[in-house]
């Protein structure tokens, strides 16, 4: 999983799929490279992600909760329309921080 630092923000590129076989590894990688290091602002870039299952949704919620517990925030960036629809159907779009461009995501995290 690709990662880059943007000041005090960490951006992670989510792979093509986020599902049962890799969701735990993704969550662990994000924790180890952000929250565990005291970094509280995280962007997950879904621009390459085309499929997510219930385990992936659970991972998104877990990362969101972990950020809140650390007085931080996670932004979910560049979601595919099918993933956005799934979040709407589950009402997670009302809870999660979802943005379509990196500049707006960074502005949100820096306010």
What are these language model-derived features?
Residues 1-28, 46:
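STAS-typified acidic loop motif
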Residues 20-95:
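Amphipathic alpha-helical interaction surfaces in cytosolic regulatory modules
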Residues 81, 103-104:
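Acidic phosphotransfer microenvironment of two-component signaling modules
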Residues 82, 110-111:
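Short leucine-rich amphipathic alpha-helices used at interfaces
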Residues 97-101:
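Short acidic-hydrophobic, aromatic-tinged amphipathic segments that line or gate anion-handling sites
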Residues 104-110:
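Short, charged, intrinsically disordered terminal tails
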